């Protein structure tokens, strides 16, 4: 019998971000620089909000060990020098986006919906739902970062400083996702795995819709 965690991993793999046309074009050097600039500006909303997702989970967690692990992830995001938000700004600037453009960017509805989805799931009474949302995202990031770095180096001439955000997350999110998986397996003994699976699917869909906003095709995922 297939376990709920195996179902979760299969669900994520079936709609992995690397299967999206936007990232496929990125890997093949078929994106226009303006598309990358638009992406860097719009995704900034999610980058800035990510520590808030973790804070919401940390504030409501009664399990001391799990709370410490969430705090470690939060510290990775907030306390580095440079921190992860600054690394993203560095990436945007390397693409020719100005500080003023980044600060004054009007975020798309797709970006706002994505952040709202993560915030709502991380505020759910069931802690496992929020952890499942972050796991769904972070388990994909190391592979995505490998392709992003390769594309940025080969096709766009971005320096190591420019893509440092992805270098950091290529390593860090292996650890974060592994810890989140362990936390999920601890919590789901007390909580409903169906709610975790549903929350994960909502994350997959909102990520897919966000990426679709940067290309002409807005068709739903047909990779299942």
Swiss-Prot record:
Cofactor: Fe(2+); Mn(2+)
Amino acids binding Fe(2+) 2: 77, 138, 173, 176
BP terms from Gene Ontology: small molecule metabolic process; sulfur compound metabolic process
UniProt keyword annotations, A-Z: Iron, Metal-binding, Oxidoreductase
SMART domains membership: Haem_oxygenase_2
Membrane found in the keyword field: no
UniProt EC number: 1.3.3.-
Source superkingdom: Bacteria
GO molecular-function terms, A-Z: metal ion binding; oxidoreductase activity
Annotated Fe(2+) 1 binding sites: 77, 84, 169
Cofactor note: Binds 2 divalent metal cations per subunit.
Keyword tRNA-binding attributed: no
Site (Side-chain cleavage): 23
Subunit structure: Homodimer.
NCBIfam families for this protein: fol_rel_CADD (TIGR04305)
Protein family according to the UniProt entry: Belongs to the CADD family.
Protein purpose: Involved in de novo para-aminobenzoate (PABA) biosynthesis. Acts as a self-sacrificing or 'suicide' enzyme that utilizes its own active site tyrosine residue(s) as the substrate for PABA synthesis. The side chain of the tyrosine residue is released from the protein backbone via cleavage of the C(alpha)-C(beta) bond, leaving a glycine in place of the original tyrosine residue. Reaction requires O(2) and a reduced dimetal cofactor.
Protein name, as recorded: 4-aminobenzoate synthase
Origin organism lineage: Bacteria, Pseudomonadati, Chlamydiota, Chlamydiia, Chlamydiales
């Amino acid at each position: 019998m297939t376990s709920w965690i195996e179902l979760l991993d299969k669900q994520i793999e079936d709609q992995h971000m690397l299967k999206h046309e936007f990232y496929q074009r990125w890997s093949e050097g078929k994106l226009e620089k303006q598309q990358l600039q638009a992406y860097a500006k719009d995704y900034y909303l999610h980058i800035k909000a990510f520590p808030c997702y973790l804070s919401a989970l940390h504030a409501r967690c009664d399990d001391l060990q799990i709370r410490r692990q969430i705090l470690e992830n939060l510290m990775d995001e907030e306390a580095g020098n440079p921190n992860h938000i600054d690394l993203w700004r560095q990436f945007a600037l390397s693409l020719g986006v100005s500080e003023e453009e980044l600060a004054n960017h009007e975020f798309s509805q797709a970006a706002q919906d994505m952040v709202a989805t993560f915030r709502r799931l991380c505020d759910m009474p069931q802690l496992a739902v929020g952890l499942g949302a972050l796991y769904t995202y972070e388990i994909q990031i190391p592979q995505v970062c490998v392709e992003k770095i390769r594309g940025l180096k080969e096709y766009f001439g971005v320096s190591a400083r420019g893509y440092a955000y992805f270098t950091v997350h290529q390593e860090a999110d292996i650890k974060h996702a592994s810890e989140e998986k362990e936390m999920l397996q601890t919590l789901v003994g007390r909580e409903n795995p169906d709610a975790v699976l549903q929350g994960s699917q909502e994350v997959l869909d909102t990520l897919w819709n966000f990426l679709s906003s940067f290309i002409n095709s807005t068709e739903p995922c047909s990779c299942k």
